[in-house]
Curated annotation (Swiss-Prot):
Enzyme Commission no: 2.1.1.166
Binding site for S-adenosyl-L-methionine: G76, W78, D99, D115, D139
Active site positions, chain numbering: K179
Protein name listed in UniProt: Ribosomal RNA large subunit methyltransferase E
Length: 225
């Protein structure tokens, strides 16, 4: 261990015989990430919880009594924050967490193991909520191939699919929040969001790693419904 420029201890992971360099770097980054350590202390399932909390602190889109849909929710960091802020734990708001992967129970959160891309997903979601959603949010990231153009197409395609789902289930005035990357929403998606929402902006919370190209698109004031 050694101290970095901030005075924190820095953990260096030794390379094992079978450990790939990428795995070593990932593990080293996790061990030295203050948000990872803080998430464990605060009882959050992932460091991503701080990203949502920070964005909501600034833009105030999560409100008591709202109905929230968390796409690609596992392991549940965003759902934890949403449940607290809309009062789902007290039965005032609702949070539906959707993922293909299983996810452990979270107080106030209803989990649905389904594919949001399936044709009947919007109908199932509305039935679970007893109506539309006030917020659809997605911290999903597409699987990468290492080929920049291919990966960009996958990223944009995933955000477009999430936006299309949101357009089917959001109440008027609703909010859509989704992970994009440095290029942000592409021109076609940006134009679509501007048609459907009163305001569209790109946000990079401080909890996003500085060496990451990760950003979020935040669209508020849904015009449809």
């Amino acid at each position: 261990m050694a101290k970095d420029t901030t005075g924190r201890l820095h953990v260096t992971v030794k390379s094992g015989g079978k450990r790939k360099l990428s795995s070593k770097l990932w593990l080293e980054r996790q061990l030295n990430d203050p948000y990872v350590a803080q998430a464990k202390r605060d009882g959050f399932r992932s460091r991503a919880a701080y990203k949502l909390r920070e964005m909501d602190d600034k833009y105030h889109f999560l409100k008591q009594g709202q109905a929230v849909v968390d796409l690609g929710a596992a392991p549940g960091g965003w759902s934890q924050i949403a449940a607290k802020r809309v009062g789902a734990e007290a039965g005032r708001g609702k949070v539906i967490a959707i993922d293909l992967l299983e996810m452990g129970e979270i107080p106030g959160v209803t989990f649905a193991q389904l594919d949001f891309l399936s044709d009947d997903a919007p109908e199932k979601l509305r039935a679970m909520l007893g109506g539309g959603a006030d917020i659809v949010m997605s911290d999903m990231a597409a699987n990468t191939t290492g080929h920049r153009k291919t990966d960009q197409l996958r990223i944009v395609g995933l955000v477009e699919s999430a936006a299309a789902f949101a357009a089917e289930v959001l109440n008027p005035g609703g909010t859509f929040l989704a992970k994009v990357f440095q290029s942000g929403a592409d021109a076609t998606l940006q134009a679509e969001l501007k048609r459907n929402f009163a305001t569209v902006r790109h946000v990079k919370p401080a909890a996003s790693r500085q060496d990451s190209s990760e950003r979020y698109v935040l669209a508020m004031g849904f015009r449809g419904g």
